[in-house]
């Protein structure tokens, strides 16, 4: 190269491959308030040191590639690169480590969950040097939080819209989830709402199929909730699923729901995508619609303990993207959810400020500043005998959703709804009187059956139903110490 054509990029350039840890492993780094912090569970391939594995994650999810390139000299890598600033072994696991990575805020587009995830959990999860990789938690700095609008309305505004205070809200997913005509579907909604539920719900895969087109379903469900409102004097809602094959069709359904005057719509945020979800959340905010979020497909991402992404990260992403409700597991029902871990991400959904607490799986202190909270939805295999535990675990700011636990009542849908409402009111009253729901729950339900034949019938049907399986998502403990105990 002649002196006339030599550039700054060529000065000191050495072609070839060098270890990631030489550039991206910086244990002396002091994190900034504006950094996005990530905790990865890293399982390196045999022979790969944990420092190299952690540095590889930082590199491949930020500025790095597999070899030194000329254009590195045209920017400031020290300003833009991700940094692995800490590594610790996972208790009780061989060859697993928690790698802490800090990302400069300038790496991310403002207000875009899509861009954030494309960087942090993009190609790096297919990296050959890693046997497995899981994103356990993120710390979102307040500077980045403030670029998001978050939930369309939030918990307090929803309560004000519905005029419902001092108790969890009650819902029901209409079953069978597929196959009903629009008219029969609307009839089931009406019966449940008339019986005392606050909401009924489309299931996640109810979109616009040949047996029930979306417009017909919207019309019959709107008729059902208005009729139930007139009879009960309470505000009712049905989660009209606006999820569609295109964003244009999704928005068309949301617009039609608004024109019908219903209070709430629904979206499958993982299958629909974060870009679509954020767009729908903006529309709901501008047009007074609440937004219920279903997490269909989440277990594909978060079920395995050593690979994928923990649901607490997906929950944080949803709070930023926008949603007023999200399914969060039940702890006591048929779906996955260990108590302390579930309550950890429930707090991340609802509270303004959450302290680091590894006993609940929370790796970082999170400050949401003024971002509204999200109501957790407990749904899946729950019935009246679970009501005391659900009320005690989730508290008032939650939605308890009984599908089969309403529609499976031997006397029909409306009596099933009555049973759930009576059980909830009994638990709330007992709690307010100072009784312990955890120890006296069954007694409280039995007492309530004396003045509610609907509840008595429900208790008889489901008295033997239990879902007792070991949770997959558990806290890390030292297995050798556990054995000694």
Curated annotation (Swiss-Prot):
Catalytic site positions: 175 (proton acceptor), 294 (proton acceptor)
Residue numbers bearing the N6,N6,N6-trimethyllysine modification: 14
Cofactor note: Binds 1 Mg(2+) ion per subunit.
GO molecular function: magnesium ion binding; monooxygenase activity; ribulose-bisphosphate carboxylase activity
Binding site for substrate: 123, 173, 177, 295, 327, 379
GO cellular component term of the entry, any: chloroplast
Modified residues (N-acetylproline): 3
Modification comment: The disulfide bond which can form in the large chain dimeric partners within the hexadecamer appears to be associated with oxidative stress and protein turnover.
Catalytic activity of the protein: 2 (2R)-3-phosphoglycerate + 2 H(+) = D-ribulose 1,5-bisphosphate + CO2 + H2O; D-ribulose 1,5-bisphosphate + O2 = 2-phosphoglycolate + (2R)-3-phosphoglycerate + 2 H(+)
Main location group: plastid
InterPro entries: RuBisCO (IPR033966), RuBisCo_large_chain_AS (IPR020878), RuBisCO_lsu_C (IPR000685), RuBisCO_lsu_C_sf (IPR036376), RuBisCO_lsu_fd_N (IPR017443), RuBisCO_lsu_N_sf (IPR036422), RuBisCO_lsuI (IPR020888)
EC number, as in UniProt: 4.1.1.39
Propeptide: 1-2
Subcellular location: Plastid, Chloroplast
Family: Belongs to the RuBisCO large chain family. Type I subfamily.
Note: The basic functional RuBisCO is composed of a large chain homodimer in a 'head-to-tail' conformation. In form I RuBisCO this homodimer is arranged in a barrel-like tetramer with the small subunits forming a tetrameric 'cap' on each end of the 'barrel'.
Protein name: Ribulose bisphosphate carboxylase large chain
Lineage of producing organism: Eukaryota, Viridiplantae, Streptophyta, Embryophyta, Tracheophyta
